[in-house]
């Protein structure tokens, strides 16, 4: 399957483009590539591509989802028709017909599509990082098994509506000032279904649907983050007889972790070290999502220094590598010192503030200073 182009690239706009700029650019490109105006073989495909980009970027919610998760955020949350639903295409009212042959889901006539449902799913930090399968219980309307969704009593069947002849629509013609006006309305006898039920099903009362609780398995991909939405097509409420079911939208909420935070696909953590480890350097063990990892603290490290552990972050959506773990070190300052520790620190301070020795004494001083530091380390880490 061909990779979709970036929506901003399609419209030739920067990512911070205003809604007004997006609309203005769309109108210009739509006029240029509309199949009624442009007879080039690729014009219709280009027009569809432009219209899809506009439908997403002109909608605040869809644009935010796209900016955060890319095409995966749109494809996981919206059906093909939902992408275009609600978009203002100006004078290009044939968009829906061009894409879907005029079949508008949940339109004003005919049996109604089932309602979409939403479920808030809470997962742990680790589950978001590595992915998880969750079984959830969803209360929803389903097709009645007694009447197989027809709404009619077993052994009987719905009859064609005598008022509309099974179309679900009634056309009315009236003449005014010598001109004829034709209007089409939903049939009031069958309420747009085209059928009437003379003997309703005793279980569903003729609705063709009943309320049930269904267990559904949700596959949360590795790299999921709070605010991400997963669309499960057809897992919403059942539609009226002859109409499709709605969709189920799973909204992801990632619970906070005691030690880790997340920025995009990077993991942020803190590590406390002693001031002797910071001054002399040391190898320390760091907790990661993948277990403990050895990390080197170089001599002279300052508090709040940040070290990067490559590929110890979170799996990117759809398997394109991992983020890193950023470890910020915090140097612990001792609060209770015994007499020996105080004396050693005073000796070290005196050496640090002392005048530079002569060349022949420098070596001795350096050795003495090192000896003091080793004593300090032993005193504070024993």
Curated annotation (Swiss-Prot):
It holds the Pfam family DnaJ_CXXCXGXG. Coiled coil: none annotated. It comes from the Archaea. Zn(2+) 1 binds at residues 144, 147, 201, 204. Gene3D superfamilies: DnaJ domain, Heat shock protein DnaJ, cysteine-rich domain, Urease metallochaperone UreE, N-terminal domain. Residues 371-382 have a biased composition (Basic and acidic residues). One of its GO terms (cellular component) is cytoplasm. This is Chaperone protein DnaJ. It comes from Methanosarcina acetivorans (strain ATCC 35395 / DSM 2834 / JCM 12185 / C2A).
